[in-house]
Swiss-Prot record:
This is Matrix metalloproteinase-20. Gene3D superfamilies: Collagenase (Catalytic Domain), Hemopexin-like domain. It comes from Bos taurus (Bovine). Residues 21-105 form a propeptide. The lineage of its organism: Eukaryota, Metazoa, Chordata, Craniata, Vertebrata. Ca(2+) 1 binds at residues 162-164, 195-196, 198, 200.
Length: 481
């Protein structure tokens, strides 16, 4: 993995090429004229010295010999180096890929570009019609979290003003000298760390974006591009997220490959765990591993009761507090109490009558009695979820009804804890049933007959009998802010 500067572009090899006679070496009779044109366009784009009006000069390592370009391509992708357009080489050329040239070094920024601070802001200024805003928000958050899990960087979303990383979906010429070209051409591009356009990430609004596989997976593209926005170039490791060619990555349960971890930590160093010691009255000293206690944008991944304590999870840490007391609130690393979970708990709930709690992460869940894990992880499909559900956003146990509500995207399921069976006629619309909650539900917990829903930096108190929100607080107030 190499640091990068300048612009990075993720694209699918275009279908329109120059009709000029290609200057390629002789090939077998099976090699079609379309393959010649495709290869020439590919080599011109990724293995030839080019310039960019706002990006800076890109200097190729080698000469312009076509045979030499082919050999460079073959060497980069680990193919047999022949200088000929054999089948394996053409297979590589036809793959969707990122548009950063494999033989160039950008010169826009001196040295190895990286951010000089640990907390970066991001803002999504324009959305795509392919997905709901909540889905786009979630994809971006997950893509950034993939990187912050490995290095001491924190990402804070803002809704107005200029952010370090400005994210938008654009069409055609959008003012940065790198116009988009419509469906199945360039997918996205990102600028390396720096002032002005530095860090900005643009997605082609002409593409069909999705969180699944029926289109271009937004998480996959965003995670790759954010790697460039943080300062990484391409990797020659085919298993790496930063490998040049597009490869679908499942957003749920994704873990940054080792090569990417090595590269990003070379720039920013490893993320260090918090010591878990009690905090002073005004909060802990600054530590990049812990979200600022009184950050107005603080949100939680999961919230649950466990015995007489309330647990609130965020990234690699969780807070423990008494329900009716604000004193003694203390953060700890998740691994210190739940080593099997590591980090990033998706959802959690407790059935107090049984003395058991359930923790969800990706397509798996764990059962605990107190802080003691009860065996290995199990599959969430034990609950009766359809196979397309691959993670749970939030869960809350309703004591009187003896039912658990599971929130997945903009829908929710109802699970009968007595019958150990998912109820019929679900999922249902979360917005229709809980209309007072704005945004996707990240976490939920029932206390004293009320359901508290956490959505981003806000917590909503919902009266289950009136089916209405009765008050709204900042999520950070739950840890004493």
């Amino acid at each position: 993995m190499l640091p990068a500067s300048g612009l990075a572009v993720l694209l699918v090899t275009a279908l329109k090429f120059s009709t000029a006679a290609p200057s390629l070496p002789a090939a077998s009779p099976r090699t079609s004229r379309n393959n010649y044109r495709l290869a020439q366009a590919y080599l011109d784009k990724y293995y030839t010295k080019k310039g960019g009006p706002q990006i800076g000069e890109m200097v190729a390592r080698g000469g312009n010999s076509t045979v030499k370009k082919i050999k460079e391509l073959q060497e980069f992708f680990g193919l047999r180096v022949t200088g000929k357009l054999d089948r394996a080489t053409m297979d590589v050329i036809k793959r969707p890929r990122c548009g950063v040239p494999d033989v160039a070094n950008y010169r826009l920024f001196p040295g190895e570009p990286k951010w000089k601070k640990n907390t970066l802001t991001y803002r999504i200024s324009k959305y795509t019609p392919s997905m709901t805003p909540a889905e786009v928000d979630r994809a971006m958050e997950m893509a950034l979290r993939a990187w912050s899990s490995a290095v001491p960087l924190n990402f804070v979303r803002i809704n107005a003003g200029e952010a370090d990383i400005m994210i938008s979906f654009e069409t055609g010429d959008h003012g940065d000298s790198y116009p988009f070209d419509g469906p199945r051409g360039t997918l996205a591009h990102a600028f390396a760390p720096g002032e002005g356009l530095g860090g900005d990430t643009h997605f082609d609004n002409a593409e069909k974006w999705t969180m699944g596989t029926n289109g271009f997976n937004l998480f996959t593209v965003a995670a790759h591009e954010f790697g460039h926005a943080l300062g990484l170039a391409h990797s020659t490791d085919p298993s790496a997220l930063m490998f040049p060619t597009y490869k679908y990555q499942n957003p749920y349960g994704f873990r940054l490959p080792k090569d990417d971890v090595k590269g990003i930590q070379a720039l920013y160093g490893p993320r260090r765990a918090f010591s878990g010691k009690p905090t002073a009255p005004h909060g802990p000293p600054h530590n990049p591993s812990i979200p600022d206690l009184c950050d107005s944008n603080l949100s939680f991944d999961a919230v649950t009761m466990l015995g007489k304590e309330l647990l609130l999870f965020r990234d690699r840490i969780f807070w423990r507090r008494q329900v009716h007391l604000m004193s003694g609130i203390r953060p700890s690393t998740i691994t210190s109490s739940f080593p099997q979970l590591m980090s990033n708990v998706d959802a959690a709930y407790e059935v107090a009558e049984r003395g058991t709690a359930y923790f969800f992460k990706g397509p798996h869940y764990w059962i605990t009695r107190g802080f003691q894990m009860q065996g290995p992880p199990r599959t969430i499909y034990d609950f009766g979820f359809p196979r397309y559900v691959q993670r749970i956003d939030a869960a809350v146990y309703l004591k009187d009804a003896q039912k658990t509500l599971f929130f997945v995207g903009d829908e929710y399921y109802s699970y009968d804890e007595r019958k150990r069976k998912m109820e019929k006629d679900y999922p249902k619309s979360t917005e229709e049933e809980f209309s007072g909650v704005n945004g996707q539900i990240d976490a939920a917990v029932e206390l004293n007959g009320y359901i508290y829903f956490f959505s981003g930096p806000k917590a909503y108190k919902s009266d289950t009998e009136k089916e209405d929100v009765v008050s709204e607080l900042k999520s950070s107030s739950w840890i004493g802010c």
